[in-house]
């Protein structure tokens, strides 16, 4: 048996079952384990309850149970500067950002990693459902989690090789049910705690009300691309491509099909809507992406075929990547895809391996007759 006692691992403990079992497994494997709770947001909820206090109490219970030291570190400034300001700026520009991708890149695997190094850590560990495999050259490859329903590689796609080299995902190969079983068998206080949902560190508060506290809403016209007015919207930032709820439009026209958001015009403050789930305006053939990063230093070439996800839990789609610079690309789909959303992450896969990703700037159709782009989303 390998002696890990001289290898220090600092575990990011959230007060949830996944990070609790992560710390438990590492302790059982003989590592020198330290638990650290990150406070990244002043998260007093709508009822005046500070959930961070409750979560830290759970961390304390778990750490005491398994016999490891634990600390709390405050990254509220780092989160605000590196994640939240980006989040607001994207919404201000009519896009729908994915703060979880940025939070992992800038806070959990950057600010936290830096802090762990100050504690003389050899590695950090997180309770993510993803796997790391190193090849014969020592290059770290990120693979999908063993539980396909919990796989989190989509949110980890912006991590660098350096970040991955210093990271461990001890539960990455496991099923969620197995994680809960281990927690129960060990008598951990978090064994039956429900999973957190909502935006990274903002939680489950009323999103529209929350966003309105930071950005002034600008109501405007809601209309079809043919110019037919359908009412007013509350502010473009509250809507995303493909959204059905909250439009306040009944059936009408030649059918009673529901209405969906099909585009935004930021300059004129117009929200475009279309009728029918399969409305052709919701489908795109390709997209342009920026901020492209790759996890491994492998040269994929300027044109290559793989699969991609455009949102979490989506089925993989066959695509061809055409690199237009080191950090930008045009992504062409094997078949049209519905409701591509600017601001979200496009994440690339080769089988089980997550290759990296980028940010969706715009999606469009290319007309077959003159190859003109029909830009659908106007942002």
UniProtKB/Swiss-Prot annotation:
InterPro entries: MnmA-like, MnmA-like_C, MnmA-like_central, MnmA-like_central_sf, Rossmann-like_a/b/a_fold
GO cellular component: cytoplasm
The encoding gene: mnmA
Record region (Interaction with tRNA): 150-152, 311-312
Sites where the protein binds ATP: 12-19, 38, 127
Broad class of enzyme this protein falls into: transferase
Organism of derivation: Latilactobacillus sakei subsp. sakei (strain 23K)
Record-given protein name: tRNA-specific 2-thiouridylase MnmA
Role description: Catalyzes the 2-thiolation of uridine at the wobble position (U34) of tRNA, leading to the formation of s(2)U34.
Keywords assigned: ATP-binding, Cytoplasm, Disulfide bond, Nucleotide-binding, RNA-binding, Transferase, tRNA processing, tRNA-binding
Ranges for region Interaction with target base in tRNA: 98-100
Family statement drawn from the similarity comment of this UniProt entry: Belongs to the MnmA/TRMU family.
Subcellular location, record wording: Cytoplasm
Swiss-Prot/TrEMBL site (Interaction with tRNA) positions: 128, 344
PANTHER family, per the entry: MITOCHONDRIAL TRNA-SPECIFIC 2-THIOURIDYLASE 1, TRNA 5-METHYLAMINOMETHYL-2-THIOURIDYLATE -METHYLTRANSFERASE
GO molecular function: ATP binding; tRNA binding; tRNA-uridine 2-sulfurtransferase activity
EC number: 2.8.1.13
Keyword Signal: no
UniProt-annotated catalytic positions: 103 (nucleophile), 200 (cysteine persulfide intermediate)
Disulphide bridges, residue numbers: 103-200
């Amino acid at each position: 048996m390998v002696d890990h006692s001289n290898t220090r691992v600092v575990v990011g403990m959230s007060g949830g079952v996944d990070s609790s079992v992560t710390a438990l497994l590492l302790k059982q494997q003989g590592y020198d384990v330290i638990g650290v709770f990150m406070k990244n947001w002043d998260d007093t909820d709508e009822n005046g309850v500070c959930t961070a206090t409750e979560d830290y109490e759970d961390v304390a219970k778990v750490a005491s149970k398994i016999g490891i030291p634990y600390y709390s570190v405050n990254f509220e400034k780092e989160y605000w500067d590196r994640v939240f300001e980006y989040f607001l700026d994207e919404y201000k520009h009519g896009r729908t950002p994915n703060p979880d991708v940025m939070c992992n890149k800038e806070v959990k695997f950057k600010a936290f990693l830096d802090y762990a190094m100050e504690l003389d850590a050899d590695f950090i560990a997180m309770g993510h459902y993803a796997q790391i495999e190193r090849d014969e050259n020592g290059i770290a490859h990120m693979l999908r989690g063993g539980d396909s329903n919990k796989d989190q590689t989509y949110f980890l796609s912006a991590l660098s090789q350096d970040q991955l080299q210093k990271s461990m995902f001890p539960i990455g190969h496991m099923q969620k049910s197995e994680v809960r079983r281990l927690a129960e068998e060990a008598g951990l206080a978090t064994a039956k705690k429900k999973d957190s949902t909502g935006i990274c560190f903002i939680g489950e508060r009323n999103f529209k009300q929350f966003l309105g506290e930071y950005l002034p809403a600008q109501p405007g016209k809601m209309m079809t691309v043919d110019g037919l007015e359908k009412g007013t919207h509350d502010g473009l930032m509250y809507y995303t491509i493909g959204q059905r709820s909250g439009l306040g439009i009944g059936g009408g026209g030649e059918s009673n099909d529901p209405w969906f958001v099909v585009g935004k015009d930021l300059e004129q403050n117009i929200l475009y809507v279309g009728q029918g789930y399969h409305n052709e305006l919701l489908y795109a053939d390709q997209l342009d992406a920026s901020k492209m990063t790759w996890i491994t230093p492998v040269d994929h070439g300027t044109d290559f075929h793989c699969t991609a996800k455009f949102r979490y839990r989506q089925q993989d789609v066959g695509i061809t990547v055409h690199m237009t610079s080191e950090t930008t690309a045009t992504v062409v789909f094997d078949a049209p895809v519905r409701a591509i959303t600017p601001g979200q992450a496009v994440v690339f896969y080769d089988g089980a391996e997550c290759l990296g990703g980028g940010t969706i700037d715009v999606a469009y159709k290319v007309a077959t007759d003159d190859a003109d782009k029909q830009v659908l989303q106007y942002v």
